[in-house]
Amino acid sequence: MAYPWTFTFLCGLLAANLVGATLSPPVVLSLSTEVIKQMLAQKLKNHDVTNTLQQLPLLTAMEEESSRGIFGNLVKSILKHILWMKVTSASIGQLQVQPLANGRQLMVKAPLDVVAGFNVPLFKTVVELHVEVEAQAIIHVETREKDHARLVLSECSNTGGSLRVSLLHKLSFLLKCLADKVISLLTPAPPKLVKSELCPVLKAGFEDMRGELLNLTKVPMSLNSEHLKLDFISPVIDHSVVHLILGARLFNSEGKVTKLFNVAGDSLNLPTLNQTPFRLTVRKDVVVAIIAALIHSGKLTVLLDYVLPEVARQLRSSIKVIDETAAAQLGPTQIVKIMSQTTPMLILDQGNAKVAQLIVLEIFATDKDSRPLFTLGIEASSDIQFYVEDGLLVFSFNEIRADRIHLMNSDIGVFNPKLLNNITTKILTSILLPNENGKLRSGIPVSMVKNLGFKSISLSLTKEALVVTQASS
């Protein structure tokens, strides 16, 4: 067996790249204002905002407004001649979501277009009025007790100077005079109706959107016998980008937390979108935990002569160079045992990734032996690829290399382990590599991105993270 102290210097070598850890959050989902706009527009549609506009109580609002004025009786005398007044058509234009100057708030604007008709007994013509008004509200981050932060929508009202009420068609002189009086009575009503009728719908749609964003982050990711769960920590608005800061927890098969990923420090290093609608940034240590959970298998035990007879023959020849007697002991039931000594380490560069593993390799002459002929400690590395297949984020090791080999213990005397470099690489390539790739191929679902409505995605690497964005067309 391998002794922990023997690997101390190996761990030091692999851990050197961890010096100067980043202050980036474990996972960040970054959304552009375009995504926020589309999601909010869909939620308003779900709440049937058009029907709300069509049901606007214009006549009631005019009556309430007139009762407050000094000419109330005169106004009422005009209004009582209106047989009916209702919205005949209504629509909400394209939403606008833009950052405010402070870079920490977003302004939402919703242009409303309403056609209202009314009729009076003296005229058979239906008079149609065109009402244009714009609703606006502010999206910002609200921090409550226990530092709990959330996105909220507030200060909903009409945009100053956006109200326009006009005749839709030309009218006779007398009818136009009446229509002008109705317009003057109607003008104060739309801003108040925006606040009383539309703002509640806008807030309800926003709450639905916020809830959907939170639900996106709560879907657990299965990693063979383990699973990864993301935890919403806080939102951050940075000019035209909304960042959802996420922590992560790794659970074992018994549901116990085995690893916790948190935000380190108060100053966050947040990603930029670079003209993409969204960006999912997964910190390096989280990616390492995912890979480790996928490939974790304990110890591999292989009857080498039975499974890989040619490799068994090459092993016998390689050992014969060191000790002919030991080579002669290798029988048809010779066993190779392979196990990973530590969690793999991920080394990222722009566009490239490499995984380093510490591996213990034991060679037993027969299946009856309790002690190995020798034990090797191997510093192995593999180039790793990330790609998307059938909605899954898939990892794959291209090859495996025995970069350094150390003799841990030996029953055949001390020898230079470099003599076994070729056969060691052969064994790892033939046994460990397909085993690990088979487990990595199960992949992890990228449902968070799929549920946002993005069907094609692209993967890239930085020195600190794996990045998921929309694929370029």
From Swiss-Prot:
GO terms for molecular function: lipid binding. Glycans are attached at N215, N422. It comes from the Eukaryota. Disulfide bonds join C156-C199. One of its GO terms (cellular component) is extracellular space. Its main location: secreted. Residues 1-21 form the signal peptide. It holds the Pfam family LBP_BPI_CETP. May play a role in innate immunity in mouth, nose and lungs. Binds bacterial lipopolysaccharide (LPS) and modulates the cellular responses to LPS. This is BPI fold-containing family B member 1. It comes from Bos taurus.
